[in-house]
């Protein structure tokens, strides 16, 4: 979410309102405060002990080697400590919210800010207009929205709450109910209910979705290496959304028509022959002449091998082949490439092979 926000912010996109649940509520507060630096600092240095009262070194051993890496007595003592008093001690998370959430900055923000939670006391979803909250209660709202099962239960404002994602992990309705017409949803694919499946989005409302194509890790995986990687992924997924970048794994700047890329394919057939080499016997290569054999046989074959959608076009095919070569050449994923960038690398590779030969 923070990575996407960075991309939107750099592009000058005006954000008028934010709705979040669970971790999205904390990120929503940072967006309302317009404090990208603080957001990157928090997530870039995130550890388990930032959220729970735990020993990071012990968690590291558990992740790397499993429970067997610990003495039985040490493991038993740690689990008793973690889950004593009916749940995980989240005092560090409360401290983080206390140090981060600036109520006055949020109230002065021109952006609307809503959060969702589930009231166990009332047995129903409870939505909050955060900026209208009584003084001193914003941090409690953040906690109420993020009260994950397993956390030590404490009453907030006389009520017991559960993570809002359990009933509404994509709170689009909080914005449509306030008249918003152009909405960007940043998906994390956490547990819970996507309420959009059960709501009728008004016809005059446009919902754009930015969703990761890679695993973001576990829902309670608070590891700085993981969160930095996820921020980078979010940033480039934001660029994909903003500028219509192509690619499944890579980020390709391919803004021209299908006809343009068909022309490039036909002028770069040697590159396609190289891709085909594992699938075509050497003596068959001599028969790969003329355009019809490519358009009628070779290209459909490639599309199947690359698992393109049935409605693929030559822009899709060209981009998919470029991605195969980019992966083979171990090119950095988190960069924006033009076809010329990748084709240039391919030519360098072929040239080196010829020189060596």
Q: Which role does the model predict for each range below?
A:
Residues 1-21, 29-357:
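Patatin-like phospholipase
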């Amino acid at each position: 979410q923070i990575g996407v926000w960075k991309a939107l912010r750099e592009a000058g996109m005006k954000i008028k309102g934010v709705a979040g649940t669970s971790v999205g509520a904390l990120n929503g507060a940072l967006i309302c405060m317009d404090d990208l630096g603080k957001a990157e600092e928090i997530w870039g240095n995130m550890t388990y002990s930032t959220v729970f009262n735990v020993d990071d070194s012990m968690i590291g051993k558990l992740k790397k080697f499993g429970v067997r890496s610990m003495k039985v007595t040490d493991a038993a003592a740690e689990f008793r400590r973690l889950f004593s008093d009916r749940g995980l001690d989240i005092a560090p998370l409360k401290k983080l919210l206390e140090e981060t959430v600036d109520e006055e900055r949020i109230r002065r923000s021109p952006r609307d800010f809503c959060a969702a939670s589930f009231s166990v006391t009332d047995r129903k979803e409870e939505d909050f207009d955060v900026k209208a909250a009584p003084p001193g209660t914003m941090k409690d709202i953040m906690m109420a929205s993020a009260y994950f099962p397993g956390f030590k239960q404490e009453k907030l404002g006389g009520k017991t709450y559960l993570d809002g994602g359990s009933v509404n992990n994509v709170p689009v309705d909080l914005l449509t109910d306030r008249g918003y017409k152009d909405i960007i949803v940043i998906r994390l694919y956490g547990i819970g209910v996507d309420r959009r499946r059960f709501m009728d989005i008004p016809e005059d409302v446009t919902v754009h979705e930015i969703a990761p194509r890679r695993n973001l890790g576990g829902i309670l995986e608070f590891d700085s290496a993981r969160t930095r990687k996820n921020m980078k992924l979010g940033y480039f997924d934001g660029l994909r959304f903003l500028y219509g970048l192509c690619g499944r794994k890579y980020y390709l700047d391919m803004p021209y028509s299908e006809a343009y890329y068909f022309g490039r394919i036909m002028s770069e057939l040697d590159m396609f022959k190289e891709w085909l080499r594992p699938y075509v016997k050497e003596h068959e290569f001599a028969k790969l002449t003329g355009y019809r054999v490519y358009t009628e046989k070779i290209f459909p074959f490639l599309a199947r091998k690359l698992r393109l959608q049935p409605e693929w076009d030559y822009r899709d095919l060209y981009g998919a082949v470029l991605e195969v070569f980019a992966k083979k050449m171990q090119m950095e994923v988190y960069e924006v490439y033009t076809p010329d960038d990748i084709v240039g690398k391919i030519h360098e590779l072929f040239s080196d092979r010829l020189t060596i030969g």
